[in-house]
């Protein structure tokens, strides 16, 4: 049987206080750098997330604005069509009969010496009540000018809103970055 080796007592190498402090400071420095890099990555990730959210909101806003513009355009087009549309089929039939009657009278070889006063009165009445192209034109020009002014105002408002949203988002991101960054040490 072999005898086990006898244990020898070894004394640990002498540790100097200065070497230990340098090592601790170096480890603390490495830990601080690791935290700073981790915080930087975290801030960058959060900023990218906020930018993505902002871009999504901007796209949604532009899509909704486009829908609103198309809706306004369709409304204006419908108003223009309604202004030109004859409202009653009976009026169209009556106008066709009147035109046929006038055509037959004008197309005949017999020329009346005087016009029938009832026809003249009825024609004047129609001209005064239903056929007002100048009034319609003035009204349509006025509505067009109002629509143009409203469109300019809407464009100005949208530009202001976009600028305000952009500045607000930038300020919010700046505040978020300031909150996430480690506090700066000031030397006083």
Swiss-Prot record:
Its main location: cytoplasm. One of its GO terms (cellular component) is cytoplasm. It comes from the Eukaryota. GO terms for biological process: cell division; mitotic spindle assembly; mitotic spindle organization; mitotic spindle-templated microtubule nucleation; regulation of mitotic nuclear division. The keyword Coiled coil applies. Residues 141-163 form a coiled coil. It is found in: Cytoplasm, Cytoskeleton, Spindle. Keywords: Cell cycle, Cell division, Coiled coil, Cytoplasm, Cytoskeleton, Microtubule, Mitosis. The name 'dim gamma-tubulin 4' derives from the decreased gamma-tubulin staining of the spindle pole seen following RNAi-mediated knockdown of dgt4 in S2 cells. As part of the augmin complex, plays a role in centrosome-independent generation of spindle microtubules. The complex is required for mitotic spindle assembly through its involvement in localizing gamma-tubulin to spindle microtubules. Component of the augmin complex composed of dgt2, dgt3, dgt4, dgt5, dgt6, msd1, msd5 and wac. The complex interacts directly or indirectly with microtubules and is required for centrosome-independent generation of spindle microtubules. This is Augmin complex subunit dgt4. It comes from Drosophila melanogaster. The gene is dgt4.
